[in-house]
Structure formats: C-alpha cells, structure tokens
Amino acid sequence: LVPYISLSFNPLSIFFSFLVFLIGLTTNIYVLNYFKNEANESLFIFWLNCFILSMVVLVLAQNFFTLFLGWELIGLSSFFLINFWNIRRGTLKSSFKAFTFNLISDLCLLSALCCFYLESNTTDISTFLFLIFNNFSASFYLTTGTILLVICASIKSVQVGGHLWLPDSMEAPVPASSLIHSATLVSAG
C-alpha cells in the first residue's frame, strides 16, 4: 500500500473543477480591491489559492490518498485564512475552533477510508465503487465506513452538530469567509 497522487478527469470532476476555479477567480478579483494597501495581501492570496487548489485536488481525486490529501489541505488553508488577521482578539480562538472541528472530521474521513480499504482491498475510488455496487453486502467495515463518512461530511459541510465552528470563523477577512463558507466547502462535505 504505497500512497500516490492520482487524478481523474471525467465530465463531472471537470465541471466541478471549473466551478471551483470560477468561484476562486471571482474571489481573487474581489481580493484585489478589498486589500488595497494591505501589507500582507500576497500572503492572503497565497492561502486563498492554496484553498482553491486543494478543492480542485479533492474534486479530481482518483484514490483515497489523493482525496485525503485534498481534504487535509483544505483544512490547513482554512486555518490560515481564518487566522489571517491574527492581531484581532478572537481570531486565534476561532481558527483553533475551526481546526479542532476539522480535525475531528479528518479523523472520521481517515477511519472511513481505512474501513473502505479493509472492505475492498483497493484505494482506487472507481474500483471501490465498482466492487461495492456489484458485490454489495452490508458488512461491518462498509457500514462503519459509511457512518463515519456521513459524520465527516456533516462536520465539514456545517450540518447540525458540526456547525458550531462556523459563526466564530467569520473573524476571517470577507473574501475568505465568502470562499470557505460558500458552496465550495459545502460541496466538499
């Protein structure tokens, strides 16, 4: 089991990649006016584009490792975007709250992917789905993995119970809030 990055270019993943890039482009254009004369504008743009690239990696993922890598990079980028104005009093607290909830989500995803691997003995998403749909049986690993995946998605997409980090993360600059809390992150969930 050697981790490697594998991307899938099919019509659905290309469409969602285009959607992520389009939302990212409009956010980048907005940032140029929002941060006029801001000293750390380039740092913010760096983390913003890391977030966008992470979303694209997540959408194009062909195997569990690439999916998890994109998922983790989204969490890391979110942390730095929320904590961008770290001179504000509540910013560090809110960024760690978001980080903690995302860490719980990450552990659920990692556990779910391990369950799926134990069930199918593959890390390729297409092969996994083919095996599950053609040889479906409600096994312990599949059921546990599915439940963990629902918990993971609920936290990341701020559903009931996993939404507690969202209001505090509004400490981030407006462009970060708009990107993180728009359909891009909800789509990831």
What residues fall within each predicted segment?
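...captures the hydrophobic TM-helix bundle architecture rather than a specific catalytic motif
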Residues: L1-G189
